[in-house]
């Protein structure tokens, strides 16, 4: 379908850009770009860190054994549903008040919402908190892409966006590994608290980048 129905106009870059190019070492705003790559990783890590423990954790919250798998599915889906609902709205808001500001607020909100997830007493409380966390995280991907587009020379946008996607896949890889390790060695509630600390550290880093950008 994509091959037959979509026609793309290819614009060759100017000769000067093609000849000169821009290497990673000469990339302007390298710190900002690295921060965005790490933020994309954190987004996936936050969503996937509970995957290894979710069924076992829900079992401690749900008395009816026949409902465990269903509630665990709701928990995993809730964050994605929240992100679907909020992504467009947060992207528009970021265009008005600043992408780095939204990223900082989103990471802070998600990090704080992870703390009560460690102390819930029912499966539906966990579903609600994961949904709210998804609402917060929904603005990250459009904001990350926008920051990269604004800070990277035209000839490198595709390359850096490729790194961004790779970082997100790395988060999908690291998240379950971290969740399984922490859950197995420390405890399931510690998974939520550890993920919270990581997201809040990411929020602090983005806030620092935002302050530095504002003073320039």
Where in this protein do the model-derived segments appear?
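Intracellular juxtamembrane helix-capping segments at the cytosolic ends
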Residues: 139-152
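Pair of pore-lining "gating" transmembrane helices in MFS-fold secondary transporters
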Residues: 29-50, 131
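Structural signature of the two symmetry-related core transmembrane helices
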Residues: 101-116, 193-196
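Paired small-residue
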Residues: 113, 124-132
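Short amphipathic helix-loop junctions that connect adjacent transmembrane helices
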Residues: 53-70
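Juxtamembrane intracellular "pre-TM" segments in multi-pass secondary transporters
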Residues: 8-36
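C-terminal membrane-cytosol helix-exit motif in multi-pass small-molecule transporters
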Residues: 1-14, 202-210
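Helix-to-loop junctions at the C-terminal end of transmembrane segments
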Residues: 85-98, 183
């Amino acid at each position: 379908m994509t091959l037959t129905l979509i026609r793309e106009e290819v614009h060759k870059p100017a000769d000067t850009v093609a000849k000169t190019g821009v290497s990673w070492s000469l990339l302007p705003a390298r710190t900002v770009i690295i921060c965005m790559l790490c933020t994309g990783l954190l987004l996936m890590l936050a969503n996937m860190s509970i995957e290894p423990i979710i069924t076992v954790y829900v079992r401690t919250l749900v008395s009816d054994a026949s409902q465990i798998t269903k509630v665990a599915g709701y928990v995993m889906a809730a964050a994605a549903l929240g992100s679907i609902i909020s992504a467009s709205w947060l992207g528009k808001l970021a265009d008005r008040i600043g992408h780095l500001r939204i990223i900082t607020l989103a990471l802070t909100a998600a990090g704080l919402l992870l703390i009560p997830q460690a102390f819930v007493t029912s499966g539906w409380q966990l579903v609600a908190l994961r949904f709210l966390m998804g609402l917060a995280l929904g603005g990250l991907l459009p904001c990350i892409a926008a920051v990269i587009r604004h800070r990277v020379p035209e000839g490198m946008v595709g390359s850096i966006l490729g790194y961004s996607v790779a970082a997100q896949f790395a988060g999908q890889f690291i998240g379950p590994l971290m969740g399984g390790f922490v859950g197995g060695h420390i405890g399931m509630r510690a998974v939520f608290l550890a993920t919270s600390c990581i997201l809040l550290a990411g929020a602090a880093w983005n806030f620092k980048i935002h302050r530095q950008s504002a003073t320039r």
